Amino acid sequence: MASGQEKGRSELDSLAREGQTVVPGGTGGKSYEAQEKLAEGRSRGGQTRKEQMGEEGYSEMGRKGGLSTNDESGGERAAREGIDIDESKFKTKS
């Protein structure tokens, strides 16, 4: 007889195979396990980038990205609205 954890996992796997996202950050995975791996990789990728740029540069880059819309980039909107974005912080640390 399957344990409760195995049963829950198989239910999540069948939902994932139907195209639903069952793991936060696992969008696009065709199975529960695939979604777990995608979410883990995305998280690790963000952490690596944060370490490369430093806390300040990473948050500054997020500010610029948050300003973007379908019509214009974050840089264009920042310039138009007079928002100061310090791109010197974007450089990776050596």
Curated annotation (Swiss-Prot):
Expression triggers: By abscisic acid (ABA) and osmotic stress.
Region (Disordered): 1-94
Top-level division of the source organism's lineage: Eukaryota
A GO biological-process term: response to abscisic acid
InterPro entries: LEA_5, Sm_Hydphi_plant_seed_CS, Small_hydrophilic_seed_prot
Biased composition (Basic and acidic residues): 1-16, 33-53, 74-94
Further information: Wheat contains at least 10 different genes for Em protein.
Function statement: It is thought to provide protection for the cytoplasm during the desiccation stage of embryo development.
Protein name: Em protein CS41
Source organism per UniProt: Triticum aestivum
Encoding gene per record: EM
